[in-house]
């Protein structure tokens, strides 16, 4: 890895722990202005003050989300998009370039690929192209890889998740985001098969905050490099406190019980 990528990665990860708490806020394209990100600047402010390492935004939200004050936070510009209104919502297309992201001040870029989807061929082609350009510009690449399509019966199947993680590594990502399998033992398959850092996705909004923290702890026990969780952070009762609680687990190795005290 070149020094350019190393320097930029330190802006989206904790330099001491080499772990990260990333909060995606790119849901506006896929689902509209959902609860928690209606006002993007306020949403960024809350998670930044809580200690998140980075946020994921689409290019048009960078200016809207820039605070110009308070605690600094890493910026990851998302390059992929589709909407929930599409009959082929699993087929992501590129809507931004690495060069655009650089001009916007990004510390990294992210791409979304759904293996098994009808549009897999084009998404993999885009992935390969983006990773090439990222290497040229020394821009870190976060790959969000999911198993979604006619042949995927369960996207949380350990073998499917491990396949997703390996695809991210094979095609040149620097960090890969995949679903959590449900327990540390099976999630280790994804960790062991990936030579790059693996972070977990948060998925749909969970019923309880304790459940979210238990998922985070399980992933960390398996060897994850952190998390990339959206709705279970920005739709929490207090997003800043939720990030602080997660930080205790991710960066300090604390227990769920210790982390949960912050949320009481």
Swiss-Prot record:
Q: What does this protein do?
A: Catalyzes a transaldol reaction between 6-deoxy-5-ketofructose 1-phosphate (DKFP) and L-aspartate semialdehyde (ASA) with an elimination of hydroxypyruvaldehyde phosphate to yield 2-amino-3,7-dideoxy-D-threo-hept-6-ulosonate (ADH). Plays a key role in an alternative pathway of the biosynthesis of 3-dehydroquinate (DHQ), which is involved in the canonical pathway for the biosynthesis of aromatic amino acids.
Top-tier EC class: transferase
What does the record give as the active site? 26 (proton acceptor), 146 (proton donor), 177 (schiff-base intermediate with substrate)
Q: How does it assemble?
A: Homodecamer.
Q: What is its EC number?
A: 2.2.1.10
Keyword hit for Transmembrane? no
Task: List the taxonomic lineage.
Answer: Bacteria, Pseudomonadati, Aquificota, Aquificia, Aquificales
The answer to whether UniProt assigns keyword Cell membrane to this entry is no
InterPro entries per record = ADH_synthase (IPR010210), Aldolase_TIM (IPR013785), DeoC/FbaB/LacD_aldolase (IPR002915), DeoC/FbaB_aldolase (IPR050456), FbaB-like (IPR041720)
Provide the GO biological process annotations: amino acid biosynthetic process; aromatic amino acid family biosynthetic process
* Assigned protein family: Belongs to the DeoC/FbaB aldolase family. ADHS subfamily.
CDD domains recorded for this chain? DhnA (cd00958)
- HAMAP family linked to this entry: ADH_synthase
Instruction: Report the SUPFAM superfamilies cross-referenced here.
Output: Aldolase
Indicate what this protein is called per its UniProt record: 2-amino-3,7-dideoxy-D-threo-hept-6-ulosonate synthase
- Which GO terms fall under molecular function for this chain's record? acyltransferase activity, transferring groups other than amino-acyl groups; fructose-bisphosphate aldolase activity; hydro-lyase activity; transketolase or transaldolase activity
Q: Where are the transmembrane segments?
A: none
> Reaction(s) catalyzed by this protein?
1-deoxy-D-threo-hexo-2,5-diulose 6-phosphate + L-aspartate 4-semialdehyde = 2,3-dioxopropyl phosphate + 2-amino-2,3,7-trideoxy-D-lyxo-hept-6-ulosonate
Amino acids binding 1-deoxy-D-threo-hexo-2,5-diulose 6-phosphate: 26-30, 146-148, 202-203, 230-231
Supply the alphabetized keyword list.
Amino-acid biosynthesis, Aromatic amino acid biosynthesis, Schiff base, Transferase
Tell me which domain of life the UniProt entry assigns to the organism this sequence originates from.
Answer: Bacteria
UniProt source species: Aquifex aeolicus (strain VF5)
């Amino acid at each position: 890895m070149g020094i350019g990528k190393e320097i930029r990665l330190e802006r989206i990860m904790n330099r001491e722990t080499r772990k990260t708490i990333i909060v995606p806020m790119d849901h506006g394209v896929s689902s509209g202005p959902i609860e928690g990100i209606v006002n993007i600047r306020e949403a960024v402010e809350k998670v930044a003050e809580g200690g998140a390492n980075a946020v994921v935004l689409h290019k048009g939200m960078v200016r809207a989300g820039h605070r110009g004050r308070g605690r600094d936070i890493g910026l990851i510009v998302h390059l992929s998009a589709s909407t929930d209104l599409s009959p082929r919502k699993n087929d992501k297309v590129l809507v931004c370039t690495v060069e655009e992201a650089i001009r916007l001040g990004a510390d990294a870029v992210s791409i979304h690929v759904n293996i098994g989807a009808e549009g897999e061929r084009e998404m993999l082609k885009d992935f390969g192209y983006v990773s090439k350009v990222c290497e040229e510009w020394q821009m870190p690449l976060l790959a969000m890889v999911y198993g979604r399509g006619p042949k995927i019966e369960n996207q949380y199947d350990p073998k499917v998740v491990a396949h997703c993680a390996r695809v991210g590594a094979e095609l040149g990502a620097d960090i890969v985001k995949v679903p959590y399998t449900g327990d540390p033992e099976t999630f280790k398959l994804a960790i062991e098969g990936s030579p790059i850092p693996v972070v977990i996705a948060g998925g749909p909004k969970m019923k309880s905050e304790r459940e979210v923290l238990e998922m985070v702890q399980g992933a960390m026990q398996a060897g994850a490099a952190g998390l990339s969780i959206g709705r279970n952070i920005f739709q929490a009762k207090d997003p800043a406190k939720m990030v602080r609680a997660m930080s205790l687990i991710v960066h300090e190795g604390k227990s769920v019980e210790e982390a949960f005290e912050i949320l009481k």
